[in-house]
């Protein structure tokens, strides 16, 4: 077996493994907890890194098409994770010095959290559509 055949075999094995895990979890996305979604986001990063590592042995057009279905999912999941982090940060800020927090602080915190929660609902709807598109996309490494 020459080096390019060995590299392709390695890549196919890794890509199939990561893709199987991502697809299995994507099918359960609507029922996942925030922690499970965060873990899915990390698994998707592993798939993306594997794709990046193996990309040069496949036609660019096929790789890019697959990456284009994965990219918006990662962006939206990242945003949803940021919303959770912001909520925790605001909560921590307000509880750190309860006597120093003025009504204006609570009002501002409510506006910030409310705005992000509204955006998160829209983002989540788009995320579900993106996931369905991803699940319908054929893996480029399975093409002959």
List each model region and its residues.
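Cationic, histidine-enriched alpha-helical/coil surfaces that engage anionic ligands
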Residues: 1-144
């Amino acid at each position: 077996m020459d080096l390019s055949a060995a590299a392709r075999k390695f890549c196919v094995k890794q890509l199939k493994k990561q893709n199987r895990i991502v697809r299995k979890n994507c099918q359960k996305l609507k029922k996942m907890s925030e922690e499970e979604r965060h873990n899915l986001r990390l698994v998707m990063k592993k798939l993306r890194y594997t794709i990046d590592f193996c990309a040069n042995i496949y036609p660019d057009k096929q790789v890019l098409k697959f990456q284009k279905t994965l990219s918006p999912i990662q962006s939206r999941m990242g945003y949803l994770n940021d919303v959770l982090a912001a909520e925790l940060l605001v909560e921590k800020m307000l509880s750190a010095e309860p006597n120093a927090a003025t009504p204006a602080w609570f009002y501002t915190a409510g506006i910030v959290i409310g705005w992000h929660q509204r955006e998160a609902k829209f983002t989540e709807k788009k995320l579900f559509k993106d996931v369905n598109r991803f699940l319908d996309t054929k893996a480029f490494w399975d093409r002959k």
